[in-house]
Amino acid sequence: MEDLGENTTVLSTLRSLNNFISQRVEGGSGLDVSTAAPGSLQLQYEQSMQLEERAEQIRSKSYLIQMEREKMQMELSHKRARVELERAANTSARNYEREVDRNQELLARIRQLQEREAAAEEKMQEQLERHRLCKQSLDAASQQLREREDGLAAARETISSLKGRVSEMQLNAMDQKVQVKRLESEKQELKEQLELQQRKCQEASQKIQELQASQEERADHEQKIKDLEQKLCLQEQDAAVVKNMKSELLRLPRMERELKRLREENTHLREMKETNGLLTEELEGLQRKLGRQEKMQEALVDLELEKEKLLAKLQSWEKLDQTMGVNLRTPEDLSRFVVELQQRELTLKEKNNTITSSARGLEKAQQQLQDEVRQVSAQLLEERKKREIHEALARRLQKRIVLLTKERDGMRAILGSYDSELTQAEYSAQLTQRMWEAEDMVQKVHAHSSEMETQLSQALEELGVQKQRADTLEMELKMLRAQTSSAETSFPFCKEEVDALRLKVEELEGERSRLEQEKQALEMQMERLTLQGDYNQSRTKVLHMSLNPASMARKRQQEDHARLQGECERLRGLVHALERGGPIPADLEVASSLPSSKEVAELRKQVESAELKNQRLKEVFQTKIQEFRKVCYTLTGYQIDVTTENQYRLTSRYAEHQSDCLIFKATGPSGSKMQLLETEFSRSVPELIELHLLQQDSIPAFLSALTIELFSRQTSI
């Protein structure tokens, strides 16, 4: 602006000089015409020559001045170009540092992703282990159900055998009824022959006694039928138990279907996780690109701020050894100190990992021992129940054997009475048939008694085996309890480690609850997807293409990493070239992509205009603040100063001393409430505080009363 003003002044002086010369020439010509003196022409010519010489001198001086100014402008332009080159070098160095930081961030993210992938694989292994355990438990349950089915089949066989026996007993009862009818007919025949054959009266009476005995036998048989009916009721109860077991068996395929559905959901969630990871990686890439663009736009604006920050950092570096008490003269010393701290942190982390791994091993061992104790206790209860069942069965069989022996003895007594009372001549065909039937019954009873004895012996043997098994299980339970107690005593931990492990367990439980909540959220999301028209995984087959998106994403990530490394190498070469001060190679000029001089000039102008605007705004703001403070001071009589955050100091214009002030602290949301802090001056006015603040709860009234009191003191003095 000053150069332009000086140029305009030179041009205006030249123009005024030319006008003056033209006016003198015109005035001289008028004198020539009027006077026509021959000597005046020579004088005028000399004057004009002098004026022309002066004009030439002025022009040469102005030209010299202009050349000097152009020289100064060239020097300024050279200085500006040098400053621009230095700034460009600084920006390139900063960009290189940023790229290095970004590469480190990318490497850290890659490590984090690898760690997440390893954690996901561990979780997958844990889930596979859980599925395997569930499968084993299902196999065990199916084995138990098969055993129960075998028991039910055996019970059905016993029921069918008992039904056969009941049918046989019913047939025997029918035969006995037929015999009773036949005996009644014989009784009638004997009554008809009573008058003719008085000798056979005794036989008739004997036959009557036999009939009475047969009636008693029939009553016994009816009692046996009732007993068998009771047994049938018990068998029906057993059948109801069998039915319940069948219903439990019917639940097994539903549980298998649910397990299959959970596995499919797990695979689907893994695929969703992979797609989500790809989308997050793409989103991070886009965010990084957006951040780069924004940083490139804000780089020129932040140059001065970074300069100030660097100066502050330089000062902090110079004061760092004094503040920290560590000999840190250079950044290399700080980097070494940071590396040592990181190594210490790694050692502490390794110790922590070893402690946590040992704690996890102990927890797993304790959990396994607890599971084994539960299993052994459950097996012990089952064996005790089986033993009680076998003991009850043995008691029933013993009762049945006693009844059968009684029946056998009764039948033998009846046959003996028949043999003793009847003679050889009096045997008839009916008696022989009856004898054969009685012998058959005796043989059947013997066979049944032998079967009952074998069953009793088997039941007693099984009872002994079950007792031995129960004893062994009790011994194993005692051994496991002793092992748990020895394990607890063999691993003494200090109280702090136990507390740390408990905290770790609580954190794991919280994580488990969080994972359960996430699982519920994912299940709800799956339900929403199914409502929105998602496909059914049990009916739809998912085809995985040969071009896996995960592998493509990894390949793309590797290419980006290689490209970034190439850019870093090019930027290193550019920085070295700028540090040497030599010419920049062509490939580095292309790679550097520095802005042109016009763009730099425009951006400088924009920066200068923005700085001028900011400076003007600051000046206006300061003036307005000063005016506002003066107005508040004149209107309220108090000067308000901000001491610290949310604390304000009020000094009255009528105060006797400069230290007489009040301090208020802003509390509540957005400083809606003010609290008076205790000072020496506030202790001198307890009456006003009690009246206006405690009773009336009015700060303006308190300030106005204090102003009146101070004003009255000054006027009274």
UniProtKB/Swiss-Prot annotation:
GO MF terms, alphabetically ordered: identical protein binding; kinetochore binding
GO BP of this protein: attachment of mitotic spindle microtubules to kinetochore; cell division; mitotic spindle assembly checkpoint signaling; negative regulation of T cell proliferation; positive regulation of mitotic cell cycle spindle assembly checkpoint; regulation of metaphase plate congression; thymus development
Chief location of this protein within or outside the cell: nucleus
Cross-link (Glycyl lysine isopeptide (Lys-Gly) (interchain with G-Cter in SUMO2)): 61
Necessary for interaction with MAD2L1, as annotated region: 540-551
Keyword field contains Cell division: yes
Coiled-coil zones: 46-631
Modification after translation: Phosphorylated; by BUB1. Become hyperphosphorylated in late S through M phases or after mitotic spindle damage.
Short sequence motif Nuclear localization signal: positions: 79-82
Modified residues (N-acetylmethionine): 1
Compartments reported by the entry: Nucleus; Chromosome, Centromere, Kinetochore; Nucleus envelope; Cytoplasm, Cytoskeleton, Microtubule organizing center, Centrosome
N6-acetyllysine modifications at: 61
Modified residues (Phosphoserine): 16, 214, 428
Gene3D superfamilies: 1.20.5.170, 3.30.457.60, 6.10.250.90
Keyword tags: Acetylation, Cell cycle, Cell division, Centromere, Chromosome, Coiled coil, Cytoplasm, Cytoskeleton, Isopeptide bond, Kinetochore, Mitosis, Nucleus, Phosphoprotein, Ubl conjugation
Necessary for interaction with NEK2, as annotated region: 380-532
Function statement: Component of the spindle-assembly checkpoint that prevents the onset of anaphase until all chromosomes are properly aligned at the metaphase plate. Forms a heterotetrameric complex with the closed conformation form of MAD2L1 (C-MAD2) at unattached kinetochores during prometaphase, recruits an open conformation of MAD2L1 (O-MAD2) and promotes the conversion of O-MAD2 to C-MAD2, which ensures mitotic checkpoint signaling.
Subunit relationships: Homodimer. Dimerizes via its N- and C- terminal regions. Heterodimerizes with MAD2L1 in order to form a tetrameric MAD1L1-MAD2L1 core complex. Interacts with the closed conformation form of MAD2L1 (C-MAD2) and open conformation form of MAD2L1 (O-MAD2). It is unclear whether MAD1L1 dimerization promotes the conversion of closed to open conformation of MAD2L1. Formation of a heterotetrameric core complex containing two molecules each of MAD1L1 and of MAD2L1 promotes binding of another molecule of MAD2L1 to each MAD2L1, resulting in a heterohexamer.
Name of the protein this chain belongs to: Mitotic spindle assembly checkpoint protein MAD1
Highest classification ranks of the organism: Eukaryota, Metazoa, Chordata, Craniata, Vertebrata
